[in-house]
Amino acid sequence: MNTSKASKKRKAVTRDVEEEAGVFSGDELNTGNLDGALSDNAHDLSSDEDESDSEVELIDDFSDEEDEEEEDVLDSDEIPSDGEDSAKKKSNAAPGELGAVIDDDDDDDDDESPSEEEQLNYRIEKDANGNDRFVYDEINPDDNSDYSDVDENANTIGNIPLSFYDQYPHIGYDINGKKIMRPAKGEALDALLDSIEIPKGWTGLTDPSTGKPLELSQEELELLRKVQMNEIPEDGYNPYEPIVEWFTSQQEIMPLSAAPEPKRRFVPSKHEAKRVMKIVKAIREGRILPFKPPTEEDEEDDTIVKYDLWADEAERKDHPMHIPAPKLPPPGYEESYHPPPEYLPSRKERKTWEEADPEDRDREFLPNDFGSLRRVPGYENFVKEKFERCLDLYLAPRVRRSKLNIDPESLLPKLPSPEELKPFPTACATVFRGHKGRVRTLAVDPSGLWLASGGDDGTVRVWELLTGRQLWSVKLSEEDPVNVVRWRPGKDALILAAAAGDDIFLAVPPIVDPAMEKASLDILDAGWGYAASVPPPTPAEANKKNNPPKWMRPSSSLADSGVCAVIPLRYVAKSLSWHRRGDYFVTVCPGSSTPASVAIAIHTLSKHLTQYPFRRRIKGGGPPQAAHFHPSKPILFVANQRSIRAYDLSRQLLVKILQPGARWISSFDIHPTSSTASGGDNLIVGSYDRRLLWHDLELSQRPYKTLRYHRKAIRAVKFHPGGRYPLFADASDDGSLQIFHGSVTGDMLSNATIVPLKVLKGHKITGELGVLDVDWHPREPWCVSAGADGTCRLWM
């Protein structure tokens, strides 16, 4: 093996190292001997060459594979290539000997290796100490290299802020370790010229690594243009390539596999069930806690910072012109998934709605009925409605309407104080006890001295009003209660009418002086002569079912008690009212079995005559409940369950129909000064649905006032007679009486004034019944009440 070939195999850089024992391995080369031989003794070349031959032979003992691995591992920056070694030999050898070496190398290179210019990638320069310094060329990588293109002006300081070099004239180092000087900055004029003549790729920014203006390349500008124009940055990419239907182009009729579905796909997994049951058992036994409460150490740990998001929350004030959006109306019954049947449209309504234009429809949808909430489908107009709502909120102008700051109490009429409206009854003065059972009715005589009462025991009792002493009593029936007692108006006689069972009894109580008693008996006996003069009815008239009853004389026992006449009505009468002259009175039999033609009867006292003014049932409102004569006109007011009708008896015409709006009328009364001082007719109505209604016939057929102060049904209402005191009262099943002030004037422009005055309580509720009747003293502001507890009370 020749020397040139060995030198070609291994060439080392000449370095000054300490002389040590030569250790040859696959990773290190001892070039100290070779370097010393070339530099110290130029005349011992032959001996040195022999030594080098031995060294080279030792090196050649290694395999070629190890040489290749060593060449790959050695760094090119630390160990020079073959060209570098030969160049070093040229510089260190003698001129004559160096030429021989070069000649040998050239001969070998011409035969075995490329030219020296292609292999050498460095140049030798002298450093500051005069030593040789190898300067390598920049790496020019090819397509197969791992290196990228190296910029000539690249700053290789790494990820270091340039602020570290603010105090130095340079800004970094290049790959050779040379300083990269800070670029010169132009003056104001240069900056102006640069701004006028903007070069292509100018950005106005400064490159942080070089300090020079940052310019974009043509490729970067083209990329920015495509991004700005929403174009595809990559060239040659077609986003609209034709779709290849790989799986749907051919229709497969037969299944790919006809194997039946395995049972495990639709049967619950037993293994999963076992795992779940293990977890459930562990949870039940407490070995697994679904929620582990925090320990006291965690709660009291001060190192854990807990932030309160709403600690510093402050409400933001609304804009001065802020107007809140109007709220949507709440949904109605028609929007329910299971609405009532009356809200569901019929076929005709549905067809009409479908044929109408959307603008002409009264609603945006039709109510539908679903059996359950899970059957309700999605609402198809949901998005449309929300969009229209957004349009309304966005486009519709809003107007702030200023509310009137009016005190609600100022809108109410100024009512006088109850203290200014005295006298009126405030306390119970006398209690009348003696009846067994309920006291259903009572009445005060026109003189104001006597009180008559009737109850469930079938007796009529007369009391002295002020003392409460019983003066007279008569038992009219053994089984039926006394429903009504009324005194004949007028002071010329003392006649008491009472309705018990199917009969009407007329009596003269023996409690007055003989002259008054004789005058009363004469009035009752005068009718017997007129009745005897009337010719008897024909056989055809006698065979009629609903003939008027004939007045009869009472039995001897009743006659001895003071009863003078009996009228057999054949039906139970619940209402009895006298005409103001005292010659007529009207009775009402409201029973459901009572024929309509005999329900209302008018009786003439002077003729002992009974007439039926109505041949047919009053239309609407059910059977009649009560009837009263007008205090100054020949008008009869008849009330059924829901309406009150006024009939002119002289002309036999229907004058007016009143609609109180009550479900069941219990009683009513007419103002005593109607059409005289007040200029119009006024009446009050009580109903079983707890309402007290005031009617002004000149205003409307509807109630002028509706008062709801009772908790239970109202049984009776009554005006103070004579009109001396503008008072009226009502009696209710809640055990109380309520006293009202109700004044009317002759001025047609002013309405009635109604003021609640007093609530009188004293009767006990017995069998869900309280106060059953009420009446006034004819001259004093006193009232008397009858209760279901078997007592009567005088309120003063």
Swiss-Prot record:
Its main location: nucleus. It comes from Aspergillus fumigatus (strain CBS 144.89 / FGSC A1163 / CEA10) (Neosartorya fumigata). One of its GO terms (biological process) is maturation of LSU-rRNA from tricistronic rRNA transcript (SSU-rRNA, 5.8S rRNA, LSU-rRNA). Keywords: Nucleus, Repeat, Ribosome biogenesis, rRNA processing, WD repeat. It holds the Pfam family WD40. Residues 1-134, 320-366 are annotated as: Disordered. PANTHER family: RIBOSOME BIOGENESIS PROTEIN BOP1, RIBOSOME BIOGENESIS PROTEIN BOP1 BLOCK OF PROLIFERATION 1 PROTEIN. Component of the NOP7 complex, which is required for maturation of the 25S and 5.8S ribosomal RNAs and formation of the 60S ribosome. Residues 47-84, 102-119 have a biased composition (Acidic residues). The keyword Nucleus applies. WD repeats lie at residues 434-473, 477-517, 619-657, 660-705, 709-750, 766-796. One of its GO terms (cellular component) is preribosome, large subunit precursor. It is found in: Nucleus, Nucleolus; Nucleus, Nucleoplasm. Component of the NOP7 complex, composed of erb1, nop7 and ytm1. The complex is held together by erb1, which interacts with nop7 via its N-terminal domain and with ytm1 via a high-affinity interaction between the seven-bladed beta-propeller domains of the 2 proteins. The NOP7 complex associates with the 66S pre-ribosome. This is Ribosome biogenesis protein erb1. Residues 123-134, 345-366 have a biased composition (Basic and acidic residues). GO terms for molecular function: large ribosomal subunit rRNA binding; ribonucleoprotein complex binding. Residues 326-343 have a biased composition (Pro residues). Belongs to the WD repeat BOP1/ERB1 family.
